[in-house]
Amino acid sequence: MELQDEKVVRAVPSIGYVHRGLEKLVELRDFQQYVYVAERVCGICSFGHGWGYSRAVEEMMEIEVPPRAEWLRTIWHELSRIHSHLLWLGLAADAMGFESLFMEAWRLREIDLDLIEQTTGGRIIFSVCKVGGVRRDIDGAVLKEMKRVLKDLSEKFLPMLNVFMDDDTVHSRLKGVGKLTMEEALELGCIGPMARASGILTDIRAAEKDSVYGQLHFQPVIETDGDCYARARVRLREVLRSVEIIEGCIDNIPDGPIDVKVRGVPPKRECFVRVEQPRGEALYYVKGNGTKFLERFRLRTPTNANLPALVKMLQGCDLADVPNIILTIDPCISCCER
């Protein structure tokens, strides 16, 4: 950053210094083995990356995933979203010196992580998604207990949310800071909570009418102020929306198998799918060549898409506001350095 009297004059992203070459590894791994690599693009969004890659391969190979597997995938994806947003809340509170809220947010995050561990065996890397379905089922008793735990989590989260949103310190640090109008957000290609905080109705979950989200009549969370406070509100309201989605999945999940046997190898075709990660829309592109090794895998992560907007918001802001502006786009260095 270039500064002039405590004001940011110019900001330039500096990425690519710890590039890991995960996309290149698709040429060296069986297309089914690569799910494990895709999950390691990012720890916070690990399930979503494994799901996005699996969906792309399934569409390319015309594999029909059993309905129960799709509902289970949705449950785990929303648990991952709750985990991500509570992690973000703790970091944001810590950056503002709100240490009690930081500890409370991460205490609730542990409840969510315990549910993930109980149903997948892992807390960060789930390793339950596969091409053709999922590796684990969740029985009725566990689903019933999950619904009770999530109800308790939301009841504890709501008063904490109100305290955060009504606090004078939070208002002074976030309101009117890092403002991005709807027109600017559209021009800069914002996605996810960044776009929804500026009044743009964009959410892949709502766009896919034939998915589980469509059957649950999902409606995205929208704010219109476009500042750091609005972006915080979107993420925190999405925690409660994710709880509602999981409860709907538990009430409506069908019986049946959780995977199908994958036969053959990916054909000479290409395909891409979109997944709404906690930070925004991620694009997954795959290209087959008739062997068990894919010719190409390409991933566009949410942080990359939101970087131009971050540069715009930082120009002209006070140096003291830089950490909060960066935090409210919820950047993921691991996603950028894949």
Task: Spell out what each predicted region is.
Residues E2-R338:
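Active-site bordering "gate/hinge" segments
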